[in-house]
From Swiss-Prot:
Protein name: tRNA (guanine(26)-N(2))-dimethyltransferase
Gene: trm1
PANTHER family in UniProt: N 2 ,N 2 -DIMETHYLGUANOSINE TRNA METHYLTRANSFERASE, TRNA (GUANINE(26)-N(2))-DIMETHYLTRANSFERASE
Record's function text: Dimethylates a single guanine residue at position 26 of a number of tRNAs using S-adenosyl-L-methionine as donor of the methyl groups.
Record organism: Methanothermobacter thermautotrophicus (strain ATCC 29096 / DSM 1053 / JCM 10044 / NBRC 100330 / Delta H) (Methanobacterium thermoautotrophicum)
Source taxonomy: Archaea, Methanobacteriati, Methanobacteriota, Methanomada group, Methanobacteria
Record bears the keyword Oxidoreductase: no
Record-listed S-adenosyl-L-methionine binding positions: R35, R65, D83, D109, A110
Length: 380
């Protein structure tokens, strides 16, 4: 056994040489950053609701997430730590004693656990090893009004378009391997979640989304009501991408046809259905930024960097342009990113960086306007 200190808690887990779903008890040290962000997000959400909240950790493993929520998030009155692995259940109980907390510990399949506790939780956290897709229907059915659904997906090769058929099977959506494929993956996951919620007359609004390391993470507020659900799914649509000139655009609705690129005339490829609405909530993220300094986080600097990047992206159109990719298509060397952004702003366009790729920019300018700015910065 080894001792792990994370946030304000200490746990003991079996020694491991490689993170794997086959490990006796699943604990991934690389996900500390994920859990740090989650602690901050839950604190802000708790204050948004006011009063005490109940939290479900559906794939608890060592219990680290549920225990941290109890210890570090003010207002968490109860936390449920569930895992189907009997060794994990014993580990959760032992780690709870170490930290002087008492989560409700259960050993059930995640879907059964959620359905047997219908409407009980203010926060449902789904952080499996792999895809969350098989559990999303149960999560959608169980989510109470005005609750938070926090979802992790580590099957990024499917969501990003390396393997198209698995994404079609799991998420009923076609991915596309572009420079912004990680954003497309986030939007596929958000759209899939929203459609699952809509079946139960519940609406989704994305508070925060990020693609980090080997996973994608969403924080979605759930509201009940058929009218709200109808409004929510108006954010479902498709991304269209031209691989010849890198033009991209999005359309709302469920039946787009491949069409001619308005910039170069080539046929565009399609990704979706997916979420084309906002994937960052500026107010929620702003409050998270203010909360970071109140928490004991080993990755506080990285958390702040991520949140500030996500805040910059709020309200910007779907997709982004990798300036190095654009310049490569043009056969030119890339100028400093700041110069490109300044040029676009001077031309009257909105522009921001993206947390997903350091050489990417978000803007409401089209590829033609970007090429004009680049031409001014890099004369022949």
């Amino acid at each position: 056994m080894i001792t792990v200190n994370e946030g304000s808690v200490t746990i003991r887990v079996p020694d491991f040489s490689k993170v794997s779903a086959r490990a006796p008890v699943f604990y991934n040290p690389a996900m500390e950053f994920n859990r740090d962000v989650s602690v901050v997000a839950l604190q802000v959400f708790q204050r948004l609701l006011g009063g005490e909240i109940s939290v479900a950790d559906t794939f608890s493993g060592s219990g680290i997430r549920a225990i941290r929520y109890l210890v570090e998030v003010e207002g968490v009155s109860e936390a449920f730590a569930n895992d189907i692995n009997p060794l994990a259940v014993e580990c959760i109980k032992n780690n709870s004693v170490i930290n002087s907390v008492s989560p409700e510990v259960s050993r059930e399949d995640a879907s059964i656990f959620l359905r047997s506790n219908h409407g009980r939780f203010d926060v449902i956290d789904i952080d499996p090893f792999g895809t969350p897709a098989p559990f999303m229907d149960s999560a959608a059915a169980s989510a109470r009004n005005n609750s938070l659904l926090a979802v992790t997906a580590t099957d990024t090769s499917s969501l990003c378009g390396t393997y198209i058929k698995p994404c079609l099977r799991k998420y009923s959506s076609r991915p596309l391997k572009t420079e912004y494929c990680h954003e497309t993956g986030l939007r596929i996951l958000a759209g899939f979640t929203a459609m699952n919620l809509a079946r139960y007359r519940k609406a989704a609004s994305v508070l925060l989304s990020h693609s980090s390391q080997h996973y994608m993470r969403l924080y979605i507020r759930v509201r009940r009501g058929a009218r709200r659900a109808d409004e929510s799914i108006r954010n479902i649509g498709f991304m269209l991408h031209c691989f010849r000139c890198l033009h991209h655009e999005h359309v709302n609705g469920f039946a787009p046809l491949k069409r001619e690129c308005p910039h170069c005339g080539a046929e565009m490829d399609v990704a979706g259905p997916l979420w084309v609405g906002d994937i960052q909530d500026s107010k929620f993220i702003g409050e998270m930024i203010g909360e970071v300094e109140n928490k004991e986080l080993n990755t506080a600097g990285d958390v702040l960097k991520l949140l500030k990047g996500c805040l910059d992206e709020a309200g910007m159109p779907p997709g982004f342009y990798d300036i190095h990719e654009v310049c490569s298509k043009l056969g030119r060397s890339a100028p400093p990113l700041r110069d490109v952004m300044d040029g676009l702003e001077a031309a009257g366009f909105r522009v921001s960086r993206t947390h997903i790729r350091p050489t990417g920019i978000r803007t409401d300018a089209g590829i033609g306007e970007i090429e004009e700015v680049l031409a001014g910065l890099m004369p022949e």
